[in-house]
């Protein structure tokens, strides 16, 4: 990461949250 450690950790956390949300949305779409 080119960011300072704190920003890098926050960025990774945000990316992980977005991925999780996309997975949940896809699962909901498939269930319907």
Curated annotation (Swiss-Prot):
Entry GO CC:
extracellular region
Keywords of the record: Secreted
Q: What is its main location?
A: secreted
Secreted found in the keyword field: yes
| Cell compartments where the protein resides | Secreted
What's this protein's name? Secreted protein F2
Organism taxonomic ancestry: Eukaryota, Sar, Stramenopiles, Oomycota, Pythiales
């Amino acid at each position: 990461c080119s960011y300072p450690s704190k920003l890098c950790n926050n960025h990774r956390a945000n990316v992980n949250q977005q991925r999780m949300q996309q997975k949940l949305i896809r699962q909901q779409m498939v269930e319907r």
